[in-house]
Swiss-Prot record:
Protein name as it appears in the record: Probable malate:quinone oxidoreductase 4
Enzyme class at the top of the EC tree: oxidoreductase
Name of the encoding gene: mqo4
SUPFAM superfamilies: FAD/NAD(P)-binding domain (SSF51905)
UniProt xrefs under Pfam families: Mqo (PF06039)
Species for this entry: Staphylococcus epidermidis (strain ATCC 12228 / FDA PCI 1200)
Cofactor(s) of this protein: FAD
EC number, as in UniProt: 1.1.5.4
Statement: the UniProt record of this protein carries the keyword Flavoprotein: yes
């Protein structure tokens, strides 16, 4: 790359998305100057943190909201294929970072864990069986197992079967090649690698407070050093806003037209965590149920084995809790400051359109620990209050926007890339399955905003992500080859012995 092509990039936020994009960019454009600013004192403290992340290892293996029943009764698995491919892309990039020595000890951030779906009730059992039949036919999911036999379920999920009798309708499906991912640890590893890289500057306790567009087309970014209160400005070619819940207010400060007619509604996640090691040891899976009728996808409960600080833990949730902060370490004025003359009708229209969601949120806010425990007992009937404690996880800011297709006040689920017309400002908005698909999101950012570099960068990207430019959905042989390679690179051990 010629020196005349050298650019300067500012990354805002040291979460999984910024550190992923930064890690990728420093490899494909090593001469570019990258400056990462994080207002907290270390990386991965907000939504990427392992105690704040609402769901880990999203691969559409057990999350039932990615497989939707159609009016004719058939099951559409297209979204599940897409999510699974994106997770396979993420695993390739992480494997590359391990193989290249940029990060070490993959077991500190990813571990094998069965992914299981569990349902009760006649209609739900039929849905799960139909889903199994649809997924079994597709090579990406042909290792799925299904049972309605309670004795088999006792082997898969012994803790959840305690106290259950062999009556009523119950079913479960299982894919053993699932994982638990500690995105906090992964983020910390990538941030440290960035800090050790040439042409990269990582600054903690530095808050981006404003932007100004300059006549030369660059941006002047105003940054406050929270250690001493000093404010300075940095000129840059590109601004990347990967600040989680803080992305919308920062995007609004740029003043770009694309920041208008969108807003956000903050939702906290609450979990109940098991404190009894004897109970924790009896569960070894990520188990998802089905959302209650008439509730949004975010309401899907799950009982998860997780690895935090090298120890096995057990969490159940999430339960929503509404508050005005956009970040866990944010301000109670965040929501109110984000309401502008240009987006107030968007937010009001959303409120009118989404009364069931508002009712659900209110019901969740007033839920006590007893209510949480009652939900848990639908998964684990013998759960005792004294073995569990409630804790507040991270924030998600649900994006609300106007679209031609859905009109004003449409709630956008998932992760979305927003950029200025000239591609100098790029912001990542949204939530689940954000962290799990972070590498695909970073690739989307590159493809949408740096098309003039695509030809030069493609060979470097393919070295990091061998399936880049090809379909793991359509190419079965490639998909199986990639899975075996990432299992080896990440020390998952999925294919070490024949089934």
């Amino acid at each position: 790359m010629a020196m005349s092509d050298k650019k300067d990039v500012v990354l805002i936020g040291a979460g999984v998305l910024s550190t992923t994009f930064g890690s990728m960019l420093k490899t494909i454009a090593p001469d570019w100057d990258i400056h990462l600013y994080e207002r907290l004192d270390r990386p991965g403290i907000e939504s990427s943190n392992e105690r704040n992340n609402a769901g880990t290892g999203h691969a559409a293996l057990c999350e039932l909201n990615y497989t939707v029943q159609q009016p004719d009764g058939s099951i559409d698995i297209e979204k599940a294929k897409e999510i699974n491919e994106q997770f396979e892309i993420s695993k390739q990039f992480w494997g590359h970072l391990v193989k290249s020595g940029e990060i070490q000890n993959p077991k500190e951030f990813i571990n094998p864990l069965p992914h299981i779906s569990f349902v009760r009730g006649k209609n739900n059992v039929k849905f799960l069986k139909d889903r199994y039949e649809a997924m079994k036919q597709f090579p990406m999911f042909d290792n799925i197992e299904y049972t309605e036999d309670i004795e088999e379920m006792r082997k898969w999920i012994p803790l959840m079967m305690k106290g259950r009798e062999d009556k009523g309708y119950m079913a479960a499906s299982k894919i053993d090649e699932g994982t638990d991912v500690n995105y906090g640890e992964l983020t910390r590893k990538m941030a440290q690698n960035l800090k050790n890289s040439p042409n990269v500057e990582v600054q903690y306790k530095h808050e981006v407070v404003d932007f100004e567009r300059l006549s030369n087309g660059k941006w002047s970014v105003k940054i406050k050093n929270l250690n001493n209160g000093q404010v300075f400005e940095h000129q840059t070619d590109y601004v990347f806003i990967g600040a989680g819940g803080g992305a919308i207010p920062l995007l609004q400060k740029t003043g770009i037209p694309e920041s208008k007619h969108l807003g956000g509604f903050p939702i906290s996640g609450q979990f109940i965590a098991c404190t009894n090691p004897q109970v924790i040891e009896q569960h070894d899976a990520k188990v998802y149920g089905k959302e209650p009728p008439g509730t949004p996808p975010m309401t899907v409960p799950h009982l998860d084995t997780r690895y935090i600080d090298g120890e096995r833990t057990l969490l159940f949730g999430p339960f929503a809790n509404v508050g005005p902060k956009f970040l866990k370490h944010g301000s109670n004025l965040d929501l109110f400051k984000s309401i502008k003359p240009y987006n107030i009708t968007t937010l009001l229209a959303s409120a009118v359109k989404n009364l069931p969601l508002i009712k659900y949120s209110f019901d969740q806010v007033i839920m006590t620990k007893e209510g949480c425990m009652n939900h848990l007992r639908t998964f684990y009937p013998e759960a005792r209050d004294e073995d569990w404690q409630v804790y507040t996880a991270g924030k998600r800011v649900q994006v609300i926007k106007d679209t031609e297709e859905n009109g004003k006040g449409f709630i956008q689920f998932g992760t979305e890339v927003v950029n200025s017309e000239d591609h100098s400002v790029i912001a990542l908005l949204g939530e689940s399955p954000g962290a799990s698909t972070s590498v695909s999101v970073a690739l989307e950012v590159l493809e949408k905003n740096f098309p003039e570099y695509a030809k030069d960068w493609e060979p470097k990207i393919k070295k990091m992500i061998p399936s880049y430019g090809e379909s793991l959905i359509d190419d079965v042989q490639l998909m199986r080859k990639i899975r075996k390679q990432t299992s080896k690179d990440l020390e998952l051990g999925f294919y070490n012995k024949a089934k």
